Amino acid sequence: MTVVRTLEGRRALITGANQGLGLAIAKAYVQAGASVMLCARDAAKLAGAQSDVAALAAADQRVCVMRADVAVPDDVSALMAATLEQLGGLEILVNNAGVYGPMGPIESIDWAEFTRAMDININGSVLPMRAVLPHFKQQRYGKIVQLSGGGATNPLPRIIAYAASKAAIVRLAESVAVDVKDFGIDVNSIAPGALNTRMMDELLAAGASAVGEAFYKRMASLAESGTTPLEVGASLAVYLGSAASDGITGRLISAPWDPWESLHDHRVELASSDIYTLRRIVPRDRSQTWGDK
């Protein structure tokens, strides 16, 4: 199959890139022509990821890695400096790093685990954004691709840290998108669908007693019958990093359910509406009149 190199010459920083969706995105980016900086906390897995991704790269592409904790300001500052030095510039940030955090009733989950999950999922997105935006503003161009999840749009009882933090980063991305729209910077979030990754394994290992019987059964069924392929979310990440998506910003886009391949044909409608955003639903949105004052 011929891969269209829509990211030819572009440079990307991808967090949480040592496994799962982050690794799939890294591979897709290199196949699309980009040079990449991969970061994660596990140096050993990161080295393995570098080898796998580099095997897909052409001679003129760079595949660099750096161990970093994206929730630690000094780590992120050093990561940004290394990225600019080793890649020679940067056009794309993919914020993929994230964790489920503790699972169980909110009154009994471990508080340190809860705050750590919130730190990784929220600050681990804010800090890389803060690091890249001065560079993006100076060059008046950039792409920020934020990974979201089911917790952003639906309640996830007993997976509170994940749900709350995912909702937070979607609103973060939308707010930053408005703030930087005059600099040619696009900021979008991806809902990748249910993925058969380490995080799914953690959820199933926690068991029904931790995550609730109904949710556990639904996830176990998905794991057996078919989750969303990693390549689907990775392909959307490529699209949102490419010139084809220029001007599409502030959106939460579902990789398996939205017709994202043709969103560039609807830039005007997107820019003038709240399509693909988080909003409060009022009665009239459901053809009810009793809610109007």
Feature annotation, model-predicted:
Residues 32-48:
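Conserved glycine-rich Rossmann-like NAD(P)H-binding loop of the short-chain dehydrogenase/reductase
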Residues 11, 18-19:
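Conserved glycine-rich cofactor-binding loop
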Residues 43-44, 67-79, 111:
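The beta1-alpha1 cofactor-binding region of Rossmann-like NAD(H)/NADP(H)-dependent oxidoreductases
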Residues 189, 211-293:
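C-terminal helical subdomain
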Residues 77, 100-115, 138, 158-161:
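Conserved mid-core segment of classical short-chain dehydrogenase/reductases
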Residues 129, 165:
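Active-site helix of classical SDR
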Residues 107-126, 141, 145, 169:
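Catalytic Tyr-X3-Lys loop
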Residues 154, 175-185, 244-246:
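Active-site-adjacent segment of SDR/Rossmann-fold oxidoreductases
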